[in-house]
A protein has these predicted regions:
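Bacterial N-terminal signal peptides
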Residues: 11-22
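Transmembrane beta-barrel domains of Gram-negative outer membranes and organellar outer membranes
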Residues: 27-256
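Bacterial N-terminal signal peptides that target proteins for export
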Residues: 2-13
Length: 256
C-alpha cells in the first residue's frame, strides 16, 4: 500500500495547530490566554462573539467565529460554555471549517479579600471539552479532555495582576497530559481603555512534542456599559515554528 506522506504531514500539522489554537479561543480570560479567579456577578451575563487562531509552520487554524457565554449562577460561582465554528487551513491543503469542540466549565472563587487586604483573590475553574469537532479534518481533539486550574488576582489602583495554571487530561493516540502556567499585568489607561501583557508556558501536549513559551499583548475598550471590544495578538518565544508563529483574538462582548 502506498503511503501518502503529504496527507500524513497535513494531519500532523492540523493536530499541532488545533492544540496550539485551542488556547487562543478558550481556557482564558478574554482577550488573553491566562485566566483570572473573578466570576461574573450573581444574575449577570457575559456574551462574546469572537474569532481566534494560531499560525504554525505549514498551517493556521482556530475559531472562525464562536460564542462564549458566562452566567453568574450563585455568589462566587460562574457557569461557562463556548460553542465554536472551527477552521483549519494547511499549506498545500484545502481550507476546512465546521463545528469545533464544545467547552463547558464552572468558575468558583473561594477567597474574596476586601479592598484593604494584602492577600489575593483565589479561585478554581475546572473545564471539560466535548469532542464535537471532526478531528480528522483538524477541527477537534477527537476525545473528551479535561482541565483543572487555580487562579489568583490582586488589584491596586489602576493596575491588575493575575495568573496561575493547571493540568490538562489529554487522551488520544500520540497525545499526553500537560501543564500550563501563565501571568498577566494590566493597566486601566483611561476610563474606557485597559491594556495588558501576558507570558505563559505549556509543556508538550504530544509525545515527542515541544514545550512552548509565548506572550500576548492586548486590551479592552468599553464603548459603553454594555458593549466592549477585546483584542490581543502575540507569538511564541520557544519553538515558535511548531507552537506559535502568530496568534490573535478579537471579540465583541455584551455584558448585563
Amino acid at each position: 500500500m502506498k503511503v501518502d506522506l503529504r496527507k500524513i504531514r497535513c494531519r500532523c500539522c492540523a493536530a499541532l495547530v488545533f492544540l496550539a489554537g485551542s488556547f487562543s479561543a478558550s481556557h482564558a480570560g478574554p482577550p488573553f490566554v491566562t485566566d483570572d479567579p473573578e466570576p461574573v456577578e450573581l444574575g449577570h451575563w457575559e456574551v462574546y462573539g469572537f474569532g481566534a487562531g494560531t499560525q504554525v509552520k505549514g498551517d493556521i487554524g482556530g475559531t472562525l467565529v464562536g460564542t462564549e457565554v458566562n452566567y453568574g449562577a450563585a455568589p462566587n460561582l460562574q457557569l461557562h460554555v463556548i460553542v465554536p465554528l472551527a477552521y483549519d487551513s494547511p499549506s498545500g491543503g484545502p481550507f476546512v471549517a465546521g463545528p469545533g469542540d464544545i467547552e463547558l466549565g464552572a468558575k468558583y472563587r473561594f477567597v474574596t479579600p476586601g479592598e484593604d487586604d494584602w492577600y489575593p483573590q483565589v479561585g478554581i475553574f475546572p473545564l471539560i471539552e466535548v469532542p464535537a469537532g471532526n478531528a480528522a479534518r483538524g477541527l477537534g481533539a477527537g476525545k473528551m479532555r479535561a482541565y483543572m486550574t487555580v487562579w489568583l488576582q490582586k488589584d491596586w489602583g489602576d493596575w491588575t495582576s493575575y495568573g496561575g495554571g493547571g493540568y490538562w487530561i489529554n487522551p488520544g493516540p500520540g497525545n499526553q497530559n500537560y501543564w500550563f502556567v501563565g501571568w498577566l499585568l494590566q493597566n486601566q489607561v483611561t476610563k474606557q481603555l485597559a491594556l495588558g501583557a501576558e507570558i505563559f508556558h505549556q509543556t508538550a501536549d504530544m509525545i515527542g512534542g515541544k514545550d512552548k513559551t509565548s506572550f500576548n499583548v492586548g486590551g479592552i475598550y468599553d464603548f459603553n456599559e454594555n458593549y466592549h471590544l477585546l483584542f490581543s495578538g502575540g507569538r511564541g518565544l520557544q519553538n515558535p515554528a511548531l507552537t506559535n508563529q502568530f496568534s490573535y483574538y478579537l471579540a465583541i462582548q455584551w455584558t448585563h
